[in-house]
Design a protein with these regions (language model features):
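N-terminal leader/linker segments that initiate helical-solenoid repeat arrays
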Residues: 18-65
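Terminal, low-structured helical/coil segments at or just beyond the last alpha-helical repeat
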Residues: 34, 43-44, 50-54, 149, ...
Length: 180
């Protein structure tokens, strides 16, 4: 009996931080959808990015940061190396998959980019950057209906994102015609 109670206590102590993170994510996504200005939306996006960039391992978080820094410095090959190392240790880390997809895209490796975005969305279906990246790739591949659907989904989540709004307008006109 004592062992059962100990197991329950350990399980509860491990589940509490996960629930707190899920609650925080839900609150931030609500704030993002209700943001009244682009500036407010960007602040919430930054908080979401910070939340999603926490793997639970300082070493994996450092590899993510190094990968992002390498990508920003114009070295996508180094980024792929760092991010692949992060994913070797934490294959369920959606933020690392999204970042590696961007690095693959920068090196014209569209197949691996799509694979990483697909996996990221299975792990975190609310990841706006993954949704947007997938929509961009679909549009580039001529799959405009799918791209429009994803852009509209992102627009519902982040109505202040002007680039997404422009993509929705552009694709809607092309696919649905102009409104009278």
């Amino acid at each position: 009996m004592r062992r059962l109670l100990l197991n329950c206590a350990v399980t509860a102590s491990l589940a509490a931080p996960l629930q707190a993170q899920a609650d925080r994510e839900a609150d931030l996504l609500r704030q993002l959808s209700e943001a009244e200005t682009p500036e407010a939306a960007r602040r919430v996006e930054s908080e979401l990015d910070a939340l999603w960039s926490q793997s639970g391992s300082a070493a994996v978080d450092l590899l993510l940061k190094r990968g992002q820094d390498a990508l920003e410095a114009g070295d996508p090959e180094a980024a792929i190396g760092h991010l692949t190392a992060a994913l070797d240790h934490a294959p369920g880390f959606a933020a690392a998959r999204v970042a590696r997809a961007a690095a693959y895209y920068a090196t014209n490796r569209i197949g691996p980019a799509l694979d990483d975005l697909r996996e990221a969305l299975l792990l975190n279906p609310n990841h706006t950057e993954a949704l947007t990246g997938f929509a961009v790739l679909l549009e580039e591949m001529g799959r405009e209906e799918g791209a429009l659907e994803l852009f509209r989904r992102v627009q519902a989540m982040d109505p202040q994102d002007e680039a997404v709004a422009e993509a929705v307008r552009r694709l809607a006109v092309r696919l649905e015609g102009t409104a009278l």
